[in-house]
């Protein structure tokens, strides 16, 4: 497994952990999904977009010969030699945008590596990563931004190239192959999440409705669609969408959190309690679900209960956002020293993270 360091050329290729693998659909393409969305007036992007001159240059200077793993290293060195140091940022960019900006999130760097790798003849595709990725709270609901990596070769003779920013050798990462259209749907779901966070809930809903219809086997899409529906004052439809999704994805923890939010929005406390109990049965050790419980308890002003949930989520898997919310819960409970320690830990984990900086400004000087 290759994790994203400051210096691209310093990385090494290792065999990754693969699980729950499915066949990549040969007919799936990211540009076809984009074209279908554009035809409906949706601002969909092709994550693999890369200027032809960049592709021609990498082919000329890296070449198509040599072992695949050696060629992959040459692509990374070529990037560093031509573009210098790349920086992690919370923006989701296409391959071309990441190349020009020299920054982006794990999705952006994966897009760039796959586009360049394919240009030099590498057999490389997306894989979905199940871990604590980017998650954002919006008025008590739970939006999920997808984390992907690249796979060189095919299982079992494969290498995983993962551009996540925080390596953790003690964490089990499960990988599942993705077709290009699936990856493009997740990429555009991330863009729709940003639309929602920026206050454009109606466009986010339209994008997510389209994407979930195109790729119904990706739970993130229907999860985020339900949040958009809720934000657009369509709680009954959001409830129906979530109930159907829970039947199809009974172990996807964010669905329980959002279904609880919608039930409370509709004034159905009994259903919310039932959903919490069901979610606890399947997801008590899932840091995403535990974090969502913390958000609900914080919203109920149960700050001690929220702190317990946020601390458990952070201990299940290191997360700057969980530590930041732990700081918020401690401070709301009047526990200033505990809040100071938690926020300092969050800043140390992700000093440039936009959410952490916003929280730091909100809480003021500690």
Across the structure, where does each feature detected by a protein language model lie?
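Canonical positions in the second alpha-helix
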Residues: 210-211, 244-245, 278-279, 312-313, ...
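Secondary-structure boundary elements
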Residues: 35-97
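Long, contiguous interaction/recruitment modules in multidomain scaffold/adaptor proteins
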Residues: 89-222, 236-244, 248
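TPR alpha-solenoid repeat register
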Residues: 221, 255, 289, 322-323, ...
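Canonical tetratricopeptide repeat
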Residues: 190, 224, 258, 292, ...
């Amino acid at each position: 497994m290759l994790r994203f360091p400051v210096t691209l050329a310093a990385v090494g290729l290792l065999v990754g952990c693969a699980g729950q693998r499915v066949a990549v659909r040969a007919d799936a393409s990211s540009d076809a999904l984009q074209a279908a969305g554009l035809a409906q007036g949706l601002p969909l992007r092709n994550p693999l977009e890369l200027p032809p001159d960049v592709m021609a240059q990498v082919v000329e200077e890296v070449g198509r010969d040599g072992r695949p793993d050696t060629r992959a290293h040459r692509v990374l060195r070529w990037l560093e030699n031509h573009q210098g140091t790349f920086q992690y940022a919370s923006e989701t960019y296409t391959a071309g945008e990441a190349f020009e900006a020299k920054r982006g999130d794990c999705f952006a760097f994966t897009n760039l590596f796959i586009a360049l790798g394919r240009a030099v003849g590498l057999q490389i595709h997306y894989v979905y990563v199940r871990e604590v990725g980017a998650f954002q709270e919006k008025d008590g609901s739970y939006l999920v931004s997808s984390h992907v990596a690249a796979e060189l070769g095919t299982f079992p003779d494969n290498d995983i190239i993962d551009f996540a920013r925080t390596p953790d050798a003690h964490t089990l990462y499960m990988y599942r192959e993705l077709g290009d259209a699936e990856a493009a749907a997740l990429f555009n779901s991330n863009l729709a999440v940003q639309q929602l966070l920026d206050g454009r809930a109606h466009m986010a809903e339209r994008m997510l409705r389209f994407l979930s219809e195109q790729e119904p086997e990706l739970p993130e899409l229907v999860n985020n669609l339900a949040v958009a529906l809720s934000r657009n004052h369509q709680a009954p439809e959001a409830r129906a969408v979530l109930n159907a999704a829970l039947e199809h994805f009974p172990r996807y923890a964010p669905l329980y959190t959002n279904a609880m939010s919608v039930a409370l929005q509709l004034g159905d406390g009994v259903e919310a309690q039932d959903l919490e109990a069901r979610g606890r049965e399947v997801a008590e050790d899932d840091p995403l679900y535990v974090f969502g419980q913390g958000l609900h308890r914080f919203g109920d002003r149960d700050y001690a209960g929220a702190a317990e949930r946020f601390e458990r989520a952070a201990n299940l898997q290191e997360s700057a956002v969980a530590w930041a919310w732990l700081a918020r819960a401690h401070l709301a409970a009047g526990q200033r020293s505990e809040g100071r320690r938690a926020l300092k830990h969050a800043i140390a984990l992700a000093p440039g993270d936009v959410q952490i900086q916003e929280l730091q400004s909100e809480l003021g000087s500690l």
